[in-house]
Amino acid sequence: DDGARYVRRLSYDFGVGFRIGNPSTRGVVGFLGGLLMGEQVRTGDEAVQLTDSGLMLLPVADTAARRTYPSLSVTRLALAGGFRKIRFTTVSGFDALTAQQDMATGIQVGVLAGPSIAATRGYADVFVSGELYSGIGDTARFAELRVSVEGSANQSSQGWQGLVIGSKLSFYEKRSSRHTQTVNLELSAVQHLFFPLNLSFEDHEGGLRGFQHTGASGGRRAILRVEDRWIIPVNRRADFAIAGFTDIGHLWAGDAPFGVDSKVNSSVGLSLLAAYPSGGKRLYRIDLAVPVVGDRSSRFEVRFSVSDRTRTFWREPNDVAIARTGAVPRNIGGWTPH
């Protein structure tokens, strides 16, 4: 029953920056730069619904579908800076089956902030974006935290708009050379955006396995994932493993169009994993998920994926990534800690 709106976004940026300090040492390394960035957002007035006979306009009485999103054009001049004090620990069997990877121990902070210098009539703001990474542990146990926040302080309404928050807390425990346990908690939120957008359980990165067709969505989302993985030594040329997992999630309506406060939803399942050749970082995975608590439209799901999770700590959910201001380069203050 949800509706869709036409959204057009354009962005541009130009910046310069330089590094402070020597990254080959264990001391603090910094970054400082400036950025000219701009964005244009336009949302269509009509809300439509996809039906078997084509697109159908939603009725005017549907206030959620008729919510107004004024067009916005803004150019900002910002300063970007950050620092990191990090050393790397080489571990094996965390995000890959047996391959080695570097885990960052320490702290990293990046900040970008600046006012609008040209904007749609009557609009003026100060844009702020920040990112924090922290890691601690050794080859047997490791914990990582990443938080990324952005928003615009509207100078006329004295409020915040375009708020986007993404965060992930992970814990790894290597019980033996063949046994690894992982726990991941992901919290995401969007509020007062300049265009309609919802968070849901359907997102491949940020959603719940077994809940691809529930249709529930909102402005805030919490996901807890627990996995218990065992290596199976069946072939010297490749690595194989089996894992049991459970996903638990909840949605809050927030101010998202058609947003709802969901029940606590959960699924359990079995994963078959492989890497080729033996010691390879690329992971081939089949997830078999069965919903146990939640929406009636949830159902058994088979999911295939191929990825290399050793290269970056977190691949941000797609629905959160597209909510972010397009003119903020992802590499500003966001040095990959792995």
Language-model segment annotations:
Residues 1-76, 82-87, 91-106, 120-121, ...:
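Gram-negative and organellar
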Residues 108-338:
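C-terminal transmembrane beta-barrel domains of outer membrane proteins
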